[in-house]
Amino acid sequence: MKQTMVMEKYPVSELSIVKNETTFTSADDIINEIKSKIDAHPVAVYIATFDHYAHTKSLGENGMISNDILDAKNLICCFGKALPEANMVAVRPRSIGVVEMENEFVVSFLDAPNPQAHETMIQWVKSIKNK
């Protein structure tokens, strides 16, 4: 995993996986694998899958997709098991982005404030590189 700063203020964990380093063949396959890990987790709950590619494409001239990107989806989930203060809802739920390119997948997420949730997402993402 590498750490990057998106727009100079958002800490993101990201893993690029060359397609020959995984048995998964599409963004949907990866989303389904991570969803199965969420379903098996004692706290995490699956919320939705957002087809970011389809949404952006539907915007016509108002949308822009890099020619490198073949598919882009976000899996939305939540690890919240406590609400100690009102502003905690601002950092939830979590989103794991899966982008398919010609020769690789890029899987990324905004760093989580909860260290256990963050480590769990790192392990889920790393498990995609399974060859």
Region locations from a protein language model:
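Short active-site-adjacent structural elements
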Residues: 86-87, 99
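Terminal, regulation- and interaction-focused segments at domain boundaries
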Residues: 1-42
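Ser/Thr-rich, low-complexity intrinsically disordered terminal regions
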Residues: 32-86
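Short, surface-exposed coil-to-beta transition loops
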Residues: 90-94
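Beta-strand/loop substructures that line and gate deep hydrophobic ligand-binding cavities in soluble
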Residues: 95-111
